[in-house]
């Protein structure tokens, strides 16, 4: 199978074997969570609850401030026990709401989704995405509704999902694609509806064969919604496309190298377009989103669920029992590390994200946020 890519790049050891085959497990329901108001690029949310308030899972606890901002929501049900400034894994103190669990884990009652999301107006979909607090989950944390609102003079033709996951150690995206490919593809379809485009792409590095197979099967069903008439083949993967198909999704196996997941490199590898220096993806007609973001969009639009949890890879040579965990936003790093057997004696540094672009943590009493794809414990050899 030929693989798409770009000129240059580096080839760090991927070091994913410890978790690449481990199914996602649910982390324990935390006894308390710390929900930062600044989990995204742009203006932090403003707390709208006070100490003593009772909240439900999915209830809004922070309101967006301005156009480049999103709300934040309770990830557990319980009582607000503090509102103030707390350490963030981004390296600074940030306003946050602390919730103590009541053990019931009850959803807020006013959450509702729609089965008919492909017939919804793009503006209505953007509003749902914003109200759900969805941001880029690959680490950039840019508000998704803003990224899906390009200027009218920018003609968007392609929606691209980033499933490269080129950072060493991390496997949260690959496990999502392998275990929940329908969520990813349905999310992509919603993105395509918002952007009013007919061509979608999913770029996945070729060392993730399980993810490629699972997502390719779901991508084929996009065409299967209409009557099949023709076949075509790309990179060794067969697709059925009906004559006059209104929407198609193509899975593109990518070369394994870094930074394959960078937007400009990904667009070159999937769509074949070069984004010139000083220009943005929208200037060549493309919008890129992470696969986890796409899945979050689907769950928000279909089921009314705001972004209150995500998959986190807890791994590295400094972790005794690496795992892929489905984690509530606001769960403290030290709790997750404890659920993975704790740190080894050789652990020297803990990083949020991967070793290439991650943020070293001076302390572990910091919460998982929307952009936390991994918690990696490194030894002195890696640092």
Where are these regions (language model features)?
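N-terminal, Lys/Arg-enriched amphipathic/low-complexity engagement segments
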Residues: 1-48
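Ferredoxin-like iron-sulfur electron-transfer modules
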Residues: 34-43, 64-69, 376-383
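Histidine-anchored nucleotide/phosphate-binding helix
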Residues: 178-195
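Acidic low-complexity segments
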Residues: 82, 87-137, 142, 153, ...
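Gly-rich Lys/Arg/Thr-decorated short loops/hinges at beta-loop-alpha junctions or inter-strand turns
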Residues: 106-108, 136, 159-173, 318
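Short histidine-centered loop motifs in beta-beta connectors
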Residues: 45-54, 58
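Conserved hydrophobic positions within beta-strands
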Residues: 78-80
């Amino acid at each position: 199978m030929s693989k798409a890519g770009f000129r240059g790049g580096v080839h760090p050891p991927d070091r994913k074997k410890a978790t690449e085959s481990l199914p996602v497990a649910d982390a324990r329901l935390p006894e308390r969570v710390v929900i930062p108001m600044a989990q995204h690029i742009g203006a932090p949310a403003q707390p709208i609850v006070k100490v003593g308030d009772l909240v439900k899972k999915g209830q809004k606890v922070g309101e967006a401030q301005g156009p480049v901002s999103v709300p934040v929501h309770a990830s557990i049900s319980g009582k607000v026990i503090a509102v103030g400034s707390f350490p963030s894994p981004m390296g600074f103190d940030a306003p946050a709401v602390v919730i103590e669990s009541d053990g019931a884990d009850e959803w807020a009652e006013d959450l509702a989704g729609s089965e008919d999301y492909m017939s919804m107006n793009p503006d209505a979909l953007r509003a749902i995405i914003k109200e759900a607090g969805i941001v880029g989950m690959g680490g950039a944390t840019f508000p998704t509704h803003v990224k899906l609102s390009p200027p009218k003079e920018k003609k968007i033709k392609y929606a691209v999902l980033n499933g490269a996951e080129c950072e060493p150690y991390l496997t949260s995206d690959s496990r999502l694609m392998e275990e929940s490919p329908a969520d990813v593809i349905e999310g992509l379809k919603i993105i395509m509806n918002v952007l009013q485009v007919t061509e979608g792409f999913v770029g996945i590095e070729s060392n993730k064969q399980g993810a490629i197979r699972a997502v390719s099967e779901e991508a084929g069903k996009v065409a299967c919604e209409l009557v099949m008439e023709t076949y075509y083949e790309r990179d060794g993967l067969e697709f059925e496309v009906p004559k006059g198909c209104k929407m198609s999704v193509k899975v593109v196996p990518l070369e394994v190298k870094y930074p394959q997941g960078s937007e400009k490199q990904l667009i070159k590898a999937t769509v074949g377009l070069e984004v010139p220096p000083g220009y943005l993806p929208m200037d060549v007609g493309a919008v890129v989103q992470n696969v986890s973001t796409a899945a979050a969009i689907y769950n928000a639009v279909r089921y009314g669920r705001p972004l209150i949890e995500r998959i986190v890879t807890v791994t590295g040579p400094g972790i005794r029992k690496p795992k892929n965990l489905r984690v509530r936003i606001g769960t403290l790093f030290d709790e997750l590390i404890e659920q993975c057997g704790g740190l080894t004696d050789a652990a020297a540094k803990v990083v949020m994200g991967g070793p290439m672009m991650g943020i070293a943590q001076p302390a572990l009493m910091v919460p998982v946020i929307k952009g936390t794809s991994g918690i990696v414990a490194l030894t002195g050899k890696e640092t």
